[in-house]
Amino acid sequence: MKIGIVGAMKQEVEILANLMRNQTVTQVAGCTIYEGLINGKQVALLQSGIGKVAAAIGTTALLQLAKPDVVLNTGSAGGVADGLKVGDIVISTETAYHDADVTAFGYAKGQLPACPATFISDEKLTALAKQVAQAQGHNVKRGLICSGDSFIAGGERLAQIKADFPNVTAVEMEAAAIAQVCHVFRVPFVVVRAISDAGDGQAGMSFEEFLPIAAKQSSAMIIGMLEQL
């Protein structure tokens, strides 16, 4: 099995890249794909860049060039669900775009034409992620992760997301785009992210301060999952 891993930022992939043996590096369409072995497992690791379009371009390149059997999305997220704090783990059961709206034509909020209302994560990968999180002693929540091309820092924007998606667990900027590409290519996926901020008025400062913690926690989760894939 070849395992695809997607992260947006250098900080979100460098721990994994530094663990990789027999590494080859491919630069394509503004993205970087590292291929090699991590703890004996065949891995293709993508640094996509930030945002939905970058994530979609990178994930498409990853699937076309490296042809992984599954995709794991790693990185950081803003916690929305009650009880989440910096370093906690969120696992997707489904993803949606919080900034897509074609409801005038009868679609659900966040749904794009020719797409499902949400992109459902692979049940086996979701269960494995929860198992690994519990084994590593993390506080973990599974649920809906919402994506959009905005860094959410509280205020009206966060309030609107909560109103549109009452069961939202976390927000970030790539997961739904990655999920949509995996849906089209019929590749199983799951999103596993560590909380870097609370999506509130202090989110910008919190993100800068706690991104290294989130990157370490999410990378540890991926390493734990690799051991069992």
Curated annotation (Swiss-Prot):
<dbReference type="GO" id="GO:0008930">
    <property type="term" value="F:methylthioadenosine nucleosidase activity"/>
</dbReference>
<dbReference type="Pfam" id="PF01048">
    <property type="entry name" value="PNP_UDP_1"/>
</dbReference>
<dbReference type="InterPro" id="IPR010049">
    <property type="entry name" value="MTA_SAH_Nsdase"/>
</dbReference>
<dbReference type="InterPro" id="IPR000845">
    <property type="entry name" value="Nucleoside_phosphorylase_d"/>
</dbReference>
<feature type="active site" description="Proton acceptor">
    <location>
        <position position="12"/>
    </location>
</feature>
<feature type="active site" description="Proton donor">
    <location>
        <position position="197"/>
    </location>
</feature>
<feature type="binding site">
    <location>
        <position position="152"/>
    </location>
    <ligand>
        <name>substrate</name>
    </ligand>
</feature>
<comment type="similarity">
    <text>Belongs to the PNP/UDP phosphorylase family. MtnN subfamily.</text>
</comment>
<dbReference type="GO" id="GO:0019284">
    <property type="term" value="P:L-methionine salvage from S-adenosylmethionine"/>
</dbReference>
<keyword id="KW-0028">Amino-acid biosynthesis</keyword>
<comment type="pathway">
    <text>Amino-acid biosynthesis; L-methionine biosynthesis via salvage pathway; S-methyl-5-thio-alpha-D-ribose 1-phosphate from S-methyl-5'-thioadenosine (hydrolase route): step 1/2.</text>
</comment>
<comment type="function">
    <text>Catalyzes the irreversible cleavage of the glycosidic bond in both 5'-methylthioadenosine (MTA) and S-adenosylhomocysteine (SAH/AdoHcy) to adenine and the corresponding thioribose, 5'-methylthioribose and S-ribosylhomocysteine, respectively. Also cleaves 5'-deoxyadenosine, a toxic by-product of radical S-adenosylmethionine (SAM) enzymes, into 5-deoxyribose and adenine.</text>
</comment>
<keyword id="KW-0486">Methionine biosynthesis</keyword>
<protein>
    <recommendedName>
        <fullName>5'-methylthioadenosine/S-adenosylhomocysteine nucleosidase</fullName>
        <ecNumber>3.2.2.9</ecNumber>
    </recommendedName>
</protein>
<dbReference type="InterPro" id="IPR035994">
    <property type="entry name" value="Nucleoside_phosphorylase_sf"/>
</dbReference>
<keyword id="KW-0378">Hydrolase</keyword>
<dbReference type="GO" id="GO:0008782">
    <property type="term" value="F:adenosylhomocysteine nucleosidase activity"/>
</dbReference>
<dbReference type="GO" id="GO:0019509">
    <property type="term" value="P:L-methionine salvage from methylthioadenosine"/>
</dbReference>
<dbReference type="GO" id="GO:0005829">
    <property type="term" value="C:cytosol"/>
</dbReference>
<dbReference type="GO" id="GO:0009164">
    <property type="term" value="P:nucleoside catabolic process"/>
</dbReference>
<feature type="binding site">
    <location>
        <begin position="173"/>
        <end position="174"/>
    </location>
    <ligand>
        <name>substrate</name>
    </ligand>
</feature>
<feature type="binding site">
    <location>
        <position position="78"/>
    </location>
    <ligand>
        <name>substrate</name>
    </ligand>
</feature>
